[in-house]
Amino acid sequence: MGEKVSIILTSYNKPDYLQKAIESVIQQTHDLWELFIMDDHSNAETTAVIHKYLHDRRIQYHNSFVHPADRLKTARYATLINSALPFADGDYISYLTDDTVYHPERLSRMVQEFSHKPEAQAVYSKQKVVHVNERGEEISHFYRNANAVLDQAAFQVDHCSVMHRRSLLNLIHHKFGGYWDDDMKHWNHGDAIFWARLNNFTPFLPINEVLDTTYKTPDSFQNAYRFLPADLIDGSFVKGSDQNVYFFDQGVRHPVGEKWGFLYLNRTVAVPDPYLFQYRIGKILNIPNYILVKEADHPAIFYIEAGKKRRIVDQYAFQFYQFQRKDIVTIGKEEMETLPEGPPITWKRSELIKNPPGRRLFFIEREPFLFLNGVFHPISEQVTRKFFLHQKPISASFRNIQQFPIGKPFYPVYDEIIKKLNIATE
């Protein structure tokens, strides 16, 4: 029986971690392997790292040279994997990413499991997950255990912890017309879809030993999509992998000048590029919406919304809507005069809530809601933290807001995906 392992490593702009990933393959105690480095048109620093290893004849390199405009057409890592699979001639297929390292005995231990259990078609191992800061220092870690036979492996196993027989690929291709489903709608869970395909033919057998370690950086793919809703929230500062900051408003991402750096410092949401790039780029905003402003020598306080200044008529309205004086930004008289007047922000006890300010959190019947563009949206606590919505919620009842519709909830996208696919997570 053969024992060759084909490893498919996908990479994009992580030179330091990529080097560690490649080194971890070279240091395997099982040396009958081939490595496909499938790079998605990374920067020069990353490609320089790759070229250092191409003298090893077991290593093959493919650069996608994908055009930026085409990045939104498919789930890129799934596309890269599909490009490599037809050329893999190992008895077993294994996967790796540029932020994960194999432990030295990883291949030998999995090949051994197949040898001892001829009925095994797919195996998975325990994984150590390490969260690191911007300096690469460990903040925390936890383990993904491998202590059960999985008939539904989707959303439960990281794809760097799996090895399966190559013979399964023909069965999958015959049944589904392809290997990994690289439809863009699966951009953040392509491995889960592929595991579901594998589970049509075999369970995943466990090896409850830590055989790989994955590193989650502040800008890592996993951290970036964690707790993201299906749609970006108006009034958010966001950034992709290029670190450029945008202000999101009405479905458009507006570049933010350095003038407003004090606003987005420590409150910018990192999001995956495919998620960000679906929104077109607009012009630079003179003044972002959803901020408090006043003139230096004038007591009137305004809330900017829809490009208009809404005067907060008194202290009662200011306090009821949970505004904070520390958030007031002083602007010049000329800048203030360029803003058209919007409806004033008022509040009177025992009345219906009328014309409330947008992007404010409410607590209605013990549930959190975000009021945005005239609609109350249910919102999860994870999403409020993700988007730095730290304002104390405004207490209200459905009777107080009966004139406003209830809109689409802002819930983590993974929750929506799992419900839609009806895939078990326990």
Curated annotation (Swiss-Prot):
Coiled coil: none annotated. InterPro entries: Glyco_trans_2-like, Glycosyltransf_2, Nucleotide-diphossugar_trans. It comes from the Bacteria. Disulfide bonds: none annotated. Signal peptide: none annotated. To B.subtilis spore coat polysaccharide biosynthesis protein SpsA. May be involved in maturation of the outermost layer of the spore. This is Protein CgeD. The gene is cgeD.
